[in-house]
């Protein structure tokens, strides 16, 4: 392929494309850059796999630490398992890309995006998503593209395209929009309780920029002389389809209209209908075409029956406006919320159930040292709020090996985490590190939004002073031509057989998180707006049900939660608290049993299993760092005696010396005649010398000063 360079501009930011220079043996590749961030994306196609009924597409996003001029940590000093954010970026690329391949394609496809260079300004994820479309088109893989993605930020009252990390942090919106010529195909967003109208406007704003990138890709293909392949499905033999439709349509319709069925009863009834078709096929002569098809393709019957069920369910919703469980299109399943179900060793817990979906969320409070250290290319290096999502096989009545979290679990956990971030208290207000684990105990659709609701309950039960409670709902879509129906609170079968899964989370003030995935090639803004607006009353209904279990965060933390105190010291005194080689801070920890975390700003967080230990450590540090002036009066204890005087600890960790001449108003021959180690004495600061040493006296102290000093001790 000849080398080709192209440059585009958005809001003063350039996007540069380089083709034909890298990865010559890949099916198609592009280096896509903006600022000093550069991502190489390669797409490759292999021959079709035999005997599969799905598209074997793999999308991998790879980060290399050299991209930021860094060497990886760890013993091996090389990249290992992808960090969580890299996994989320892989999903961000995959989700708008996957629906655009034809359903009949069985070729092995792999898209690999590698960040080769990265500055601390431009995020690489949307570049990688757009690059994936370009690489796929250049590779001449059957594809209903082009597809492009942009990020939309909101700084003040202005939307901006592809904001920098700093602009994202300052703004109230971080939204990624991906689209095709047919419309919007994917949305992912975190927002600071934005109204629905603002989010819809942002999606529209982003899609306008997406269209420019789509036109640029079409122009690029023309320059390269590549004719886009618009795939056509191979000619299919309808013999089996007609047979199944004739034998099973009536039975499937009866099952779908039996609204009192539970999920398991419905599944069993559909299996019975399918079994009757199997019996009918078995009774056919061996040379019958239907029997020949099922013998040659063992999965053909199952796929055909599934397609029939999908068609009939969709027709029922479009025609009658009624769903398989009898609900109206905008109706939410029955809801149950409970808190504090687990023993008190657990800091906070919430059980949320919506229909057959049940999520148990558990909140744990930790110290600042429990924050997750992040070793990736993102500017953020720590996380103080963690949400982890688990979905064991028993949640869907299945058995399979238990594995470490996969991409789905990581993605669902991150979405629920994002939904709660805007309402969490600041580190200054609530210095705890917070971890919530959502255990999906039963799944029938919308477990990620169930995790949002369960997380809210668990945090409130744990006494975390969240600004607002958050709830979430998953919206679905059935669309045939220009006719469509938006479904509220979709269950498993509607998710599986529908066209859209649109998750919306937020408070009574506005949206905090969005995630929209498609199975079709794009949607107009009108339908997206309908889904967002229809989600609001559902969210508020769910929220009101949750608040029946717990209306406000608990006033007190669990007895078993660590106790934290946060104080501010002069950054110049950090060395004083730490001491040479950490000697002083270790001594405080050994004396009190408390854990001490000091930030570069001078913020000190003191934590312990009980309040008394933390308060003792707090008192010591405050004493060490307190500003002492001549004339201050303290109550102290004698710690050492030397021939010329005595040392007194007048503040925790702070000592001064009383010279023998300052012990009494009369002449003292021996210090031991007046003082012994352990004596409580009232002392006044006489002076602080040039070396910072404190000289004390017992002379000239008024009774009022003694009373004030004793009152200060009692108050502390």
Swiss-Prot record:
Listed PANTHER family: POLYRIBONUCLEOTIDE NUCLEOTIDYLTRANSFERASE, POLYRIBONUCLEOTIDE NUCLEOTIDYLTRANSFERASE 1, MITOCHONDRIAL
Domain KH: 562-621
The S1 motif domain, residue ranges: 631-699
Assigned keywords, A-Z: Cytoplasm, Magnesium, Metal-binding, Nucleotidyltransferase, RNA-binding, Transferase
Gene Ontology CC: cytosol
One function term, GO molecular function aspect: polyribonucleotide nucleotidyltransferase activity
The keyword Transferase is annotated on this UniProt entry: yes
Protein's recorded name: Polyribonucleotide nucleotidyltransferase
Binding site for Mg(2+): 495, 501
Record's function text: Involved in mRNA degradation. Catalyzes the phosphorolysis of single-stranded polyribonucleotides processively in the 3'- to 5'-direction.
Disulfide bonds: none
Species per Swiss-Prot/TrEMBL record: Synechococcus sp. (strain ATCC 27144 / PCC 6301 / SAUG 1402/1) (Anacystis nidulans)
UniProt subcellular location: Cytoplasm
Swiss-Prot/TrEMBL cofactor(s): Mg(2+)
Record-linked CDD domains: KH-I_PNPase, RNase_PH_PNPase_1, RNase_PH_PNPase_2, S1_PNPase
InterPro entries: ExoRNase_PH_dom1 (IPR001247), ExoRNase_PH_dom2 (IPR015847), ExoRNase_PH_dom2_sf (IPR036345), KH_dom (IPR004087), KH_dom_type_1 (IPR004088), KH_dom_type_1_sf (IPR036612), NA-bd_OB-fold (IPR012340), PNPase (IPR012162)
Enzyme nomenclature, EC number: 2.7.7.8
GO biological process per UniProt: mRNA catabolic process; RNA processing
Pfam family, one: PNPase
The keyword Oxidoreductase appears for this protein: no
Reactions performed catalytically: RNA(n+1) + phosphate = RNA(n) + a ribonucleoside 5'-diphosphate
């Amino acid at each position: 392929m000849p080398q080709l360079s192209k440059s585009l501009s958005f809001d003063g930011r350039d996007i540069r494309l380089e083709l034909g220079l890298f990865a010559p043996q890949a099916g198609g590749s592009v280096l896509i850059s903006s600022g000093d961030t550069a991502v190489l994306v390669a797409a490759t196609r292999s021959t079709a796999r035999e005997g599969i009924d799905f598209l074997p597409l793999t999308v991998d996003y790879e980060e290399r630490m050299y991209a930021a001029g860094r060497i990886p940590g760890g013993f091996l000093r090389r990249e290992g398992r992808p960090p969580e954010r890299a996994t989320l970026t892989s999903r961000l690329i995959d989700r708008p890309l996957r629906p655009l391949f034809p359903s009949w394609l069985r070729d092995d496809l792999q898209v690999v995006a590698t960040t080769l260079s990265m500055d601390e300004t431009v995020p690489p994820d949307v570049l990688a998503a757009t690059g994936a479309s370009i690489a796929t088109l250049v590779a001449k893989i059957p594809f209903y593209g082009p597809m492009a993605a942009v990020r939309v930020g909101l700084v003040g009252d202005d939307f901006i395209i592809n904001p920098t990390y700093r602009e994202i942090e300052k703004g109230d919106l971080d939204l990624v929009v991906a689209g095709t010529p047919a419309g919007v195909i994917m949305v992912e967003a975190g927002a600071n309780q934005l109204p629905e109208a603002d989010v819809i406007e942002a999606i529209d704003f982003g899609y306008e920029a997406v269209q420019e990138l789509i036109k640029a890709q079409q122009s690029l293909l023309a320059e390269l002389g590549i004719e886009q392949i618009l795939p056509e499905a191979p000619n299919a033999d309808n013999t089996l389809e007609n047979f199944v439709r004739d034998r099973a349509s009536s039975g499937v319709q009866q099952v779908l209209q039996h609204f009192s069925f539970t999920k398991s009863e419905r599944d069993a009834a559909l299996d019975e209908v399918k079994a009757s078709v199997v019996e009918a096929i078995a009774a056919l002569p061996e040379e019958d075409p239907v029997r020949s098809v099922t013998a040659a393709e063992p999965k053909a019957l199952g796929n055909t029956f599934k397609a029939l069920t999908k068609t009939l369910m969709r027709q029922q919703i479009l025609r009658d406006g009624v769903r398989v469980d009898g609900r109206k299109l905008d109706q939410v399943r029955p809801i149950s919320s409970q808190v504090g179900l687990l023993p008190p060793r657990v800091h906070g817990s919430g059980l949320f159930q919506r229909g057959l979906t049940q999520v148990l969320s558990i909140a744990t409070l930790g110290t600042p040292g429990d924050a997750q250290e992040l070793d990736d290319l993102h500017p953020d290096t720590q996380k103080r709020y963690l949400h982890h999502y688990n979905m064991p096989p028993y949640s869907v009545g299945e058995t399979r090996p238990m594995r470490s979290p996969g991409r789905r679990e990581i993605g669902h956990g991150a979405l629920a985490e994002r939904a709660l971030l805007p309402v969490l208290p600041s580190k200054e207000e609530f210095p705890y590190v917070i971890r919530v684990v959502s255990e999906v105990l039963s799944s029938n659709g919308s477990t990620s939004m169930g995790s949002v609701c369960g997380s809210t309950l668990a945090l409130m039960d744990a006494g975390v002073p969240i600004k607002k409670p958050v709830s979430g709902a998953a919206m679905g879509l059935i669309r045939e031509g220009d006719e469509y129906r938006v479904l509220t609170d979709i269950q498993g079968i509607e998710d599986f057989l529908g066209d859209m899964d649109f998750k919306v989370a937020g408070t009574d003030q506005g949206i905090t998180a969005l995630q929209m995935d498609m199975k079709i090639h794009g949607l107009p803004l009108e339908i997206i707006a309908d889904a967002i607006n229809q989600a609001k009353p559902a969210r508020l209904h769910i929220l009101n049900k949750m608040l029946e279990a717990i209306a406000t965060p608990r006033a007190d933390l669990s007895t078993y939660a660590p106790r934290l105190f946060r104080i501010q010291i002069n950054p110049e005194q950090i060395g004083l608290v730490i001491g040479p080689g950490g000697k002083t801070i270790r001594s405080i920890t050994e004396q009190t049993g408390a854990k001490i975390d000091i930030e570069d700003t001078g913020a000190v967080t003191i934590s312990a299993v009980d309040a008394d230990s933390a308060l003792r450590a707090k008192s010591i540090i405050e004493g060490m760092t307190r500003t002492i002036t001549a004339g201050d009066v303290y109550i102290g204890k004698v710690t050492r005696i030397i021939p010329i005087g005595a040392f007194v600890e007048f503040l925790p960790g702070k000592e001064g010396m009383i010279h023998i001449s300052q012990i009494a108003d009369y002449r003292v021959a021996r210090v031991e005649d007046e003082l012994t180690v352990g004596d409580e004495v009232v002392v006044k600061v006489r002076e602080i010398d040039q070396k910072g040493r404190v000289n004390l006296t017992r002379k000239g102290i008024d009774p009022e000063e003694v009373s004030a000093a004793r009152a200060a001790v009692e108050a502390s």
